[in-house]
Amino acid sequence: RNKLRTLKKIVLLIITISLSTFLQAQQGWTKDQQQVQQAVVRMFEALSNRDSLSLKAHCTADTTLYEYGQVWNIDTLINKAITLNTAGDFKRTNTFEFISTETDKNIAWVTYRLSSAITRDSKQITIQWLETALLNKEKKQWKVKHLHSTLIERN
């Protein structure tokens, strides 16, 4: 069982390094497109760090999330992902594969694959989603306004 766990960690590390290299090798993203992508990454970093203030800073005040067939606002997300998440050993590592990113003045939309390795209560799972986010530019900063998430795999 420990060998299997170690093997899973090694495979996950290889995938993470490969995707990081792939994302760094991606050519052709404009500065604006990269800023949109980084806004999404920072939002998920705040979520991973269980930092509700930073999470709110990366979202519009009227953010809506479409998760598991439900419509959530920012308070629902904070409650489910931060407030109720009391595991002392919680760790979440996110890996993104950006598929498309479009910008038009103060609005942008981005589609990506998200893979999250999550440790909670000494158990590690990996969840993969396909997501599309709509962002608005507020005071020269991109913020997530809508996020639609489709669960692809959980193991």
Q: What does each model-identified segment do?
A:
Residues D89, S116-T126:
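Short, cysteine-centered beta-strand-loop-beta hairpins and adjacent loop/turn segments enriched
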Residues S52-T103:
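A solvent-exposed, acidic/Ser-Thr-rich amphipathic alpha-helical stretch
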Residues T101-A108, K123, L135-Q141:
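A short, structured loop/turn motif at beta-sheet edges
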Residues R1-T30:
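Bacterial Sec-dependent N-terminal signal peptides
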Residues A81, F96-T101, L114-S116, L130-N136:
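Hydrophobic/aromatic beta-strand elements that line small-molecule binding cavities or substrate pockets
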Residues C59, G69-Q70, R113-S116, H148:
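A mature extracytoplasmic/lumenal domain signature
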Residues L23-A57:
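Short, low-complexity N-terminal intrinsically disordered segments enriched in polar/charged residues
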Residues Q128-N155:
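Short beta-strand edge/turn micro-motifs at domain boundaries
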